Amino acid sequence: MSRKPAANKSAKPVPVSVAGGLIDDDGLLATARTQWQFGDWSSLAQISPETLENHPQCALLALLSAAGHLQLGHADTGRNLMHLALAAGCDTRTAARLLISGVYNTLGRTAAMSGHAAPATAHFARSIELSPFRNDSPLIAQARTREQLAQTEQALCPNQTSAPESGTLPTTAGLKVQQLAAFDLGQAWSSNTVNTVIFRHHGILTWGGYQYTAFYVDEATLRVVRRTLANNHIATHDLAGQYNLRDAHNSISLGIDSAGHLHISYDHHATKLRYRRSSHPNAIADWTDEIAMTGVNEDRVTYPTFILPRAGYPLTMLYRDGVHNKGSARIKTYDEQTRNWTDRPTPILSGADQKPWTSNAYWNHPAIGSDGSLHLSFVWRTDSIGEQQLVNNVNIGYAWSPDNGLSWFTSRGQPCKLPMTQVNAETVWPVSPGSNLINQTSMALDSHNRPHIVFYANDSQGVPQYQHIWFDGEAWHQQYFSARTQPFTLQGGGTLQIPISRPEILIDSQDCVYAVYRGDLSGNRMVVSKLLGIQASREAAHAQDNPTCLWPETVDYAEPVIDRTRWCESQMLTMLLQRNQQPNGDLAHQESAAPVWLVDFSLS
């Protein structure tokens, strides 16, 4: 408003009838009251200053209009209208009830943005309970909740209203996202994130015109899916067995040999190897029984990671032998002629023999260069810190191999002696203990085969932020790509309930870099950000902290699972999406199932 309320000579203040803080209303006030009850803040904010100043119900109309402006973030206008309402005769108790009610509504919207439906509903109900109007009923609270949830979803994904519809999604930083196809693969286990942990390698893969994925339907059923890309025909086959799904580490990884035989490894957390392969090329109906690979170092397996055939190199499996703070990264290679696996004798990464403490290297997704080179980045995990059991990941390391893991080099070309340890491995980005550095994120290579790594760790204010580091051939650089304000702590054992997912990274043929993630700032929806230049301050990062929504529904605690093979071939992003719970530490599961989606997107 351009005029100060106290100086307004045209307004006609009238006494406000209040009994116990309850307002009697009629006429135009009834319309505004209904708009307030339903949370139609935009309509309340459209009441013109002239209408307010000249209406006999100026005090109450100004108060309700102020509530609308405050909910829309128009703080100055809302404040001026509050002054007008008080000057026009509204008592402070009534004004206070409206303000406190607005606080609860804001809390509800915040909870909804974070994907927490139950607290959101409770806050909206409390907002209505504090209404200064008579006879506001539970039905009004339900109506308010529906309207506010709809507004929240529209704010997050304004161009989409339902999951399976295709269309152009909202853009940022010149980013255009097109959803091209979505396939409902059926209901499946969703009591934790075992189907959607980011470290599945591969969770989806494309080979020879077919796209493959797999997930757990329940504790007795593992489903393998084959999609024929030419006609989008979906075939499935269920592998019966006994699967421990109550530990989200026990995910499924897929590989394929050059003949088209699918390889699958699953259900591990420092336990005996479980592995099968398909009996026929490009087919999923017949499988071997569970078999060993070599039988050597296969009793404490976690994180099976298949590295696909390329440049004359065979199918390879990288895996952890050991536990979280005493482990070795080992490699096995597959001979298609004999159908036998062979062990590399020396681990490539190990902290198992360190003294006076042991450690373990957690690797990010391996990346493959255009020349067939193999690139790894990793953090080191030691014992937890203190009685609080703070997760202690330190430093980001990097190495690359020109010969499928036989020899390794630093980013500057210096040879590495195997096994690489905390002592002799290259640290490309130092991160101190207790910094909430997350393990097992993602890495990709640009057109010069130079590494880009995304992760999160604390900023200088102790708040975990998404970060991107990369090597330009001479030096490593860093940028933030979030501007979070709420701290959290990685603490305890098992799979944690964390407000943000680990990020995925994609680089297109023009060296544009994208990050895919979900979290508290996106209402737990899956989003993508286009990363721009070297911007190492939180202020600069905030300018690009405006991600584009990929999927309009909350996925709760799921992480991005992508088909990196198809992206590299055709710049098509395919994701496996499912809404998942994740009890902290994998304790106290609540049985649930949710649909699994296979969805194609284009980014431009």
Q: Where do the language-model regions lie?
A:
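Residue-level recognition of tetratricopeptide repeat
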Residues: 33, 67, 102, 109, ...
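Extracellular, repeat-based ectodomains that mediate carbohydrate processing or recognition
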Residues: 167-604
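Alpha-helical segment of the N-proximal tetratricopeptide repeat
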Residues: 21-50
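Start-of-helix register in tetratricopeptide repeats
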Residues: 26, 60, 95, 102, ...
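Flexible helix-coil transition and linker loops at the boundaries of alpha-helical arrays
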Residues: 17-18, 51-54, 88-98, 132-137
